[in-house]
């Protein structure tokens, strides 16, 4: 037997958790995600967005939304840009672990769409210029995973 998730969003309820820190970038990611949801048939009123202060706060809110039972999938969006200290490494590792753990614990797909880049230029590229929009990609993954889990 082959299990596959289809890219149709009709009937899905989804949540976006987005970090306000680096909002110049994250607002573009959220826009890309909403565009993907719309293009794949997710109703506009079936998409809720929670803004958190920074990337470190994403896992807690994503887990709470997933546990609510109101959503078929949650996507997480943020931009962590390397600086002169080791803060970047701690934040990236903890956010990634937190999101993965919350998804496993709740059984709800929580998609990691947090950019981890070495420069602001790389982040801008991934938020809708040269390298596409990672928010859009995260939304498409959420649709596919929500549908896949319905078939298993």
Swiss-Prot record:
The active site is at 87 (proton donor). Pathway: Cofactor biosynthesis; riboflavin biosynthesis; riboflavin from 2-hydroxy-3-oxobutyl phosphate and 5-amino-6-(D-ribitylamino)uracil: step 1/2. 5-amino-6-(D-ribitylamino)uracil binds at residues 21, 55-57, 79-81, 112. (2S)-2-hydroxy-3-oxobutyl phosphate binds at residues 84-85, 126. GO terms for biological process: riboflavin biosynthetic process. Its EC number is 2.5.1.78. One of its GO terms (molecular function) is 6,7-dimethyl-8-ribityllumazine synthase activity. InterPro entries: LS, LS/RS, LS/RS_sf. Keywords: Riboflavin biosynthesis, Transferase. One of its GO terms (cellular component) is riboflavin synthase complex. It catalyses: (2S)-2-hydroxy-3-oxobutyl phosphate + 5-amino-6-(D-ribitylamino)uracil = 6,7-dimethyl-8-(1-D-ribityl)lumazine + phosphate + 2 H2O + H(+). HAMAP family: Lumazine_synth (MF_00178). Catalyzes the formation of 6,7-dimethyl-8-ribityllumazine by condensation of 5-amino-6-(D-ribitylamino)uracil with 3,4-dihydroxy-2-butanone 4-phosphate. This is the penultimate step in the biosynthesis of riboflavin. Forms an icosahedral capsid composed of 60 subunits, arranged as a dodecamer of pentamers. Belongs to the DMRL synthase family. This is 6,7-dimethyl-8-ribityllumazine synthase. It comes from Exiguobacterium sibiricum (strain DSM 17290 / CCUG 55495 / CIP 109462 / JCM 13490 / 255-15).
């Amino acid at each position: 037997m082959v299990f596959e998730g289809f890219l149709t969003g009709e009937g899905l309820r989804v949540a976006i958790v987005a970090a306000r820190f680096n909002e110049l970038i994250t607002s573009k990611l959220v826009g890309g995600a909403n565009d993907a949801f719309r293009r794949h048939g997710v109703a506009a009123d079936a998409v809720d967005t929670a803004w958190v202060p920074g990337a470190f706060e994403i896992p807690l809110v994503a887990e709470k939304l997933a546990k609510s039972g109101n959503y078929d999938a949650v996507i997480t969006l943020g931009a962590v840009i390397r600086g002169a200290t080791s803060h970047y490494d701690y934040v990236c590792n903890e956010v990634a672990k937190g999101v993965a753990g919350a998804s496993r614990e709740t059984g709800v797909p929580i998609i990691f769409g947090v950019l981890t880049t070495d420069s602001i230029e790389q982040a801008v590229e991934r938020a809708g210029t040269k390298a596409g929009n990672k928010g859009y990609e995260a939304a498409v993954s959420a649709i596919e995973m929500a549908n896949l889990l319905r078939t298993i």
